[in-house]
């Protein structure tokens, strides 16, 4: 069955983004927009789409939750041996996209990823709920499993193993930090004349900024 969606559209008219709103580097604006998303109680305000690619250019994306924006790096956590973990190990060039429908806003980031220091991953892992820590230990993320019962049984066994004890971070799980080289801010506007501003990192570590056509 064919599906046609050409009649589904809406106008974006809630906000604007002008040159006077910009900051010398993109980081203050990133902080402001993330705070706006949290304060507006948008659905999953820290959700971010992570785009990776194999060395020969085959892309894949998935949504994760940003856990920190620290030292001008975007930090999230996952399994090092997952599909994204393997792709980032082989090709560190990644992109991130934040989309807040309620604010009619989007941030797109391009940069290079690195593995976060182990002590920082340990510190974050210790803050996770008990069941989330157990789940991180037993999930062979992105690999085929016989069925849901397999992962449930593994979870139950690991839960019993660490009952009343500290659940240690597995060696296969930890943080990733993305250092940006390009950041685009997109604000929806009427008649599809959206506001777009692109920051690009210069060789001297300063940032250029240009308005882009919608």
Curated annotation (Swiss-Prot):
User: Could you tell me which Gene3D superfamilies the record lists for this protein?
Assistant: Electron Transport, Fmn-binding Protein, Chain A
User: Can you cite a GO biological process for this protein?
Assistant: pyridoxine biosynthetic process
Q: What is this protein called?
A: Pyridoxine/pyridoxamine 5'-phosphate oxidase
Please share the entry's free-text remark on the cofactor.
Answer: Binds 1 FMN per subunit.
| Subunit relationships | Homodimer.
Q: What does this protein do?
A: Catalyzes the oxidation of either pyridoxine 5'-phosphate (PNP) or pyridoxamine 5'-phosphate (PMP) into pyridoxal 5'-phosphate (PLP).
Pathway per the UniProt entry? Cofactor metabolism; pyridoxal 5'-phosphate salvage; pyridoxal 5'-phosphate from pyridoxamine 5'-phosphate: step 1/1; Cofactor metabolism; pyridoxal 5'-phosphate salvage; pyridoxal 5'-phosphate from pyridoxine 5'-phosphate: step 1/1
Its cofactor is: FMN
Q: Which domain of life is it from?
A: Bacteria
Its family remark reads: Belongs to the pyridoxamine 5'-phosphate oxidase family.
């Amino acid at each position: 069955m064919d599906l046609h969606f050409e009649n589904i559209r809406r106008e974006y008219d809630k906000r604007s983004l002008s040159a006077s709103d910009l900051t010398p580097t993109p980081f203050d604006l990133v902080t402001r927009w993330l705070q706006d998303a949290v304060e507006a109680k948008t659905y999953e305000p820290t959700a971010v789409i992570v785009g990776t690619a194999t060395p020969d250019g085959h892309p894949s994306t998935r949504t994760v939750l940003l856990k920190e924006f620290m030292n001008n790096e975007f930090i999230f956590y996952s399994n090092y041996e997952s599909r994204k973990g393997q792709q980032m190990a082989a090709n560190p060039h990644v992109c991130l996209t934040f989309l807040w429908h309620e604010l009619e806003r989007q941030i797109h980031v391009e940069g290079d990823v690195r593995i976060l220091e182990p002590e920082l991953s340990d510190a974050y892992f210790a803050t996770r709920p008990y069941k989330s820590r157990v789940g991180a230990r037993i999930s062979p993320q992105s690999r085929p499993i016989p069925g849901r019962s397999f992962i449930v049984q593994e979870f139950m066994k690991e839960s019993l193993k660490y009952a009343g004890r500290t659940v240690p971070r597995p060696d296969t799980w930890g943080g990733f930090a993305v250092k940006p080289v390009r950041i685009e801010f997109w604000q929806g506007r009427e008649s599809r004349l959206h506001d777009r501003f692109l920051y690009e990192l210069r060789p001297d570590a300063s940032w250029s900024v240009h308005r882009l056509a919608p």
